[in-house]
């Protein structure tokens, strides 16, 4: 189970986009994430007149490995680690630095 979920604010800690922050748009099954505005690639799209799509070069987000990102803690303004604990019989994620629930 990944500790990062959709709509979490993250920061990239390794790779060409190190230091960039963004929101998780999608979590893929293979341990990869798609983050808004991070790891942008140019994709060549072929025109399809049947669908009415125009061809050209489109810039879009590519996936990142989850090990290259850390969750962003807004209180401390730093990257943080996530832990799990049970509160009232429910599994809750929390920041390891200050113990605050996500």
From Swiss-Prot:
GO molecular function terms listed in the Swiss-Prot or TrEMBL record: rRNA binding; structural constituent of ribosome
InterPro entries with a match to the protein in the record: KOW, Rib_uL2_dom2, Ribosomal_uL24, Ribosomal_uL24_CS, Ribosomal_uL24_KOW, Translation_prot_SH3-like_sf
Source taxon at top rank: Bacteria
Biological role stated in the UniProt entry: One of two assembly initiator proteins, it binds directly to the 5'-end of the 23S rRNA, where it nucleates assembly of the 50S subunit. One of the proteins that surrounds the polypeptide exit tunnel on the outside of the subunit.
Protein family according to the UniProt entry: Belongs to the universal ribosomal protein uL24 family.
PANTHER family found in the cross-reference section: MITOCHONDRIAL RIBOSOMAL PROTEIN L24 (PTHR12903)
NCBIfam families cross-referenced by the UniProt entry: rplX_bact (TIGR01079)
Protein name: Large ribosomal subunit protein uL24
Natural source organism: Alcanivorax borkumensis (strain ATCC 700651 / DSM 11573 / NCIMB 13689 / SK2)
Organism phylogeny: Bacteria, Pseudomonadati, Pseudomonadota, Gammaproteobacteria, Oceanospirillales
């Amino acid at each position: 189970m990944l500790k990062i979920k959709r709509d979490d604010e993250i920061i990239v800690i390794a790779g060409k986009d190190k230091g960039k922050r963004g929101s998780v748009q999608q979590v893929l099954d293979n341990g990869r994430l798609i983050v808004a505005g991070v790891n942008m690639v140019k994709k060549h799209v072929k025109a399809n007149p049947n669908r009415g799509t125009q061809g050209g070069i489109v810039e879009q987000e590519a996936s990142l490995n989850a090990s290259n990102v850390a969750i962003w803690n807004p209180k401390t303004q730093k990257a943080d680690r996530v832990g799990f604990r049970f509160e009232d019989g429910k599994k809750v994620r929390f920041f390891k630095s200050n113990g605050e629930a996500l």
